[in-house]
């Protein structure tokens, strides 16, 4: 009998299991995958963008903003940096407070594994959960590796993004099974893709990136970001688009300012003056 069973050996699951174990609880960590933290492994282009130094409650969408405040005050980006320091993991700030490992994402995975081991967490990898039952004695997990009993259950199975890495709707089904309120899931942090024929006139801009200001939504649901936008062969991407996609609803406009804080008329006049100054005269052309 365990004190806590944690479902999902990703970033949240391992962090939860490690802290619970180090506080003296008997913890088992269960995941259907054979390898730990597949999403950490690919994050940040393989270098793991593990936090943002400026992260605050205003950066999160929630019906209960007080939860974000209490959660972020209870464990800050600086607390995580202190954890990295204890494990001798080097990092750097890439852009606008985004922090990445100097080496690969594997260093973060190994750090979380070590923290779990320090809490004597028991591992059940490659363990399929067929059923979860609850009774007076706690929870019982019927799995491919036998029955697991625990007084408390933590579901940290993540969302449905990137199913090729094993993501499923298991957590949503579990929440509904126990009568928890579930916000209807929809894509977030995604690029915007367009019909190929409609996008064709802009396809030649693929690879061009620039800083923009984006806005969408109204009131509390309004989102505004000053970030980089990237033109792709299928549409728009980059940090600006990934951020605004969490606030956008079908049918709503997205307003894009391609020259934030700049006067385009002045920019064009300056460019014209530069061209006039550098263009060769007809005589220069004839003599050459």
Language model feature labels by segment:
Residues 7, 148-160, 229-230:
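Short hydrophobic core segments
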Residues 152-196:
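Glycine-rich loop(s) and the adjacent beta-strand/alpha-helix scaffold that form part
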Residues 4-28:
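N-terminal Rossmann-like FAD-binding beta1-loop-alpha1 element of flavoenzymes
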